[in-house]
Amino acid sequence: MVQITKGKFDGLQRLSNDKGVIAALAIDQRGSLKKMIQQAKGTENKKDVEDFKQLVSEELTPYASAILLDLEYGTPAIKARHEGSGLLTSYEKTGYDATTPGKLPDLIEDLSALRIKENGGDAVKILVYYDPDEPAEINEIKYAFLERIGAECRAVDIPFFLEPITYDAKVTDSGSLEYAKLKPAKVKASIKEFSKPRYGVDVLKLEVPVNFKYVEGFAEGEVAYTQDEAARHFEECSDLSPLPFIYLSAGVTSEMFHKTIQFANQHNVQYSGVLCGRATWADGIEVYGKQGDDALREWLRTQGKENITSLDKLLDEGAVPWWTKYGSFEDVHVVEKQ
């Protein structure tokens, strides 16, 4: 049995579908989305980013249990979301200071967990870049930072979703074969660390532990892992986490993310859903940039809808309810926050 405070429990339920699976859409990208729209449209305008997010939210949240948004460009999209769709809100600043070692995280100055909750957020989401092999003087800053977020979320009784993005300080190309060989150990180390109760994380938003571009049978060139090795990494990560976890799409294509989730399903991985971003809507950026709002709306109602509903089917086949890590639904004991 596990005890969960009422605010956290209610938030998790609002973010989940009727099976307890988090089938969520992510569009909290800020700097990267601004650049993509600018390249497609040839102009830079905050309203373009807001409008794109709003259209995606309006058209696709009927097929998502929740949406992840930011308050910098996402307020119109928050208002436009489907009535039954929960809301995760980003708390961290976009990107990191490249002039300082360690990819250190920072928070949006005029935001707090309380303000996120007051704004209708059902959960706080934090992204942190993490290399378990970096010096302690860098990682201790990140650990203390996340301990503070966990305490803040506990204080206002809102779920804390943590997204650790792994990297290697010495191997700068995260898409390389060299990094692909390091990635499984990095992801496992991040699960071990951030599952510790001291951080107060409720759900881990995880990268898949391998780069599918280098998995035998998926790779077009060099191979970093056999399919059996890839399956073992998935299973070990699943077993390592005492917390519910969901997968992020990490900028891959819709086709590749679908194959990834199929692979997880085939190997009985205990994941509780996805937060899928660019894999669902990225191809709509070119349409929006060149042809405008109406063309994007049409794309979202056809290809965008197909991307998200076909992913929903895969989740129906393989994802487990968020409470599975604690046993059954009856094993979750909801208590009032003291």
From Swiss-Prot:
Enzyme nomenclature, EC number: 4.1.2.40
The protein's annotated pathway: Carbohydrate metabolism; D-tagatose 6-phosphate degradation; D-glyceraldehyde 3-phosphate and glycerone phosphate from D-tagatose 6-phosphate: step 2/2
Key words, A-Z: Lactose metabolism, Lyase
Catalytic activity: D-tagatofuranose 1,6-bisphosphate = D-glyceraldehyde 3-phosphate + dihydroxyacetone phosphate
InterPro entries reported in the protein's UniProt record: Aldolase_TIM (IPR013785), DeoC/FbaB/LacD_aldolase (IPR002915), LacD_aldolase (IPR050552), Tag_1.6-dipho_adolase (IPR005927)
Domain of life: Bacteria
Any one Gene Ontology BP term: lactose catabolic process via tagatose-6-phosphate
Enzyme class, UniProt record, top EC level: lyase
SMART domains noted in UniProt: DeoC
GO molecular function, one term: tagatose-6-phosphate kinase activity
SUPFAM superfamilies recorded: Aldolase
Family under the similarity heading: Belongs to the aldolase LacD family.
Alphabetized PANTHER family for the sequence: SULFOFRUCTOSEPHOSPHATE ALDOLASE (PTHR39340:SF1)
UniProt protein name: Tagatose 1,6-diphosphate aldolase
Organism: Listeria innocua serovar 6a (strain ATCC BAA-680 / CLIP 11262)
This protein's encoding gene: lacD
